[in-house]
Amino acid sequence: MCDDDVAALVVDNGSGMVKAGFAGDDAPRAVFPSIVGRPRHQGVMVGMGQKDSYVGDEAQSKRGILTLKYPIEHGIVTNWDDMEKIWHHTFYNELRVAPEEHPVLLTEAPLNPKANREKMTQIMFETFNSPAMYVAIQAVLSLYASGRTTGIVFDSGDGVSHTVPIYEGYALPHAIIRLDLAGRDLTDYLMKILTERGYSFTTTAEREIVRDIKEKLCYVALDFEEEMQTAASSSSLEKSYELPDGQVITIGNERFRCSETLLQPSFIGMESAGIHETCYNSIMKCDVDIRKDLYANTVLSGASTMFPGIADRMQKEIVALAPPTMKIKIIAPPERKYSVWIGGSILASLSTFQQMWISKQEYDESGPSIVHRKCF
């Protein structure tokens, strides 16, 4: 079906970042924010080449005059026109390829609505004229990237988190748990608690500054209560951050209060279990015979698992929940920020995968619903 000399494109559309590149590469060529920005004000200078919309890094750099929108919320595409702009930007500006010449592997969150993947399929074939495409589940790709076929993946990006138990390469759908708590919620919470310190961040542009503070300074405490006492009694945990205008702000216990939300969602008023308990619940929904393998292969993936200290804390919390003699191993690969993309790159370059592509011909015969038969 697919010529060997044409590299497949791998596009991991996250809620926060798009990771795109060529199958067989060990890292994505293009990583840019999943943002479409539109001007807030009317352009007055003629000949400036002002556009009616900006995508990715360009939108990010002009954020002061734009209204920024993320077309993917909680892993689900909510604005298809903007999404099309992002794909167009990915193919033509970032990768500089003609999409009608390359098969495309796209990724999606587990438990996504069926209509969502149908629409993705339709746009690839009808708007971009792809010769072939495939939609893979993000967490499964992360497990591939870690070199395993069995394990439980905790995947947490910007918009959505999941625990996905996988046995011998098959995701176990009845045990997948989806948690609509991820990086974007942590950023919003950090904005809120910084306001309590007297720093005001409100606009979509300022939210990006807070996201940067989160990525550079936040960490997960091994013992939250103890860390709170340390922060209250000394300034050893305080760090300073310079804002774009030169003003310097200091943050203390916010550094770990922000990420603690992953373990205590009640911080932002959510009634769900924390990520440690969610992993445990997910394992408990699986057959008793395979639980041992899942406990010993708990793989973290996604950018919201990049907080220092998260693996040790998960280990401690899951050990407390699991049976006393159980061996528990949390795997946190250093490249986990991109492990979904890396898994996609591995999958799309396997010789055994080549018959799995949905071809243009199959699409023309069956329509968008073909995606449910060929991608599982």
UniProtKB/Swiss-Prot annotation:
Q: Does the keyword Acetylation apply?
A: yes
Protein name per its UniProtKB record: Actin, cytoskeletal 3B
Predominant subcellular localization, coarse grouping:
cytoplasm
Q: In which tissues is it expressed?
A: Confined to aboral ectoderm cells.
One GO MF annotation is: hydrolase activity
Top-level EC class as recorded in UniProt: hydrolase
Q: Which residues carry this modification: N-acetylaspartate?
A: D3
Annotated source species? Strongylocentrotus purpuratus (Purple sea urchin)
Sorted alphabetically, which CDD domains does this protein's record hold? ASKHA_NBD_actin (cd10224)
One cellular component term (GO) for this entry is: cytoplasm
Q: Which Gene3D superfamilies does the UniProt entry name for this protein?
A: 3.30.420.40, Actin, Chain A, domain 4 (3.90.640.10)
UniProt-listed InterPro entries? Actin (IPR004000), Actin/actin-like_CS (IPR020902), Actin_CS (IPR004001), ATPase_NBD (IPR043129)
Name the lineage: Eukaryota, Metazoa, Echinodermata, Eleutherozoa, Echinozoa
Which EC number(s) does UniProt give?
3.6.4.-
Q: Which catalytic reaction applies to this protein? A: ATP + H2O = ADP + phosphate + H(+)
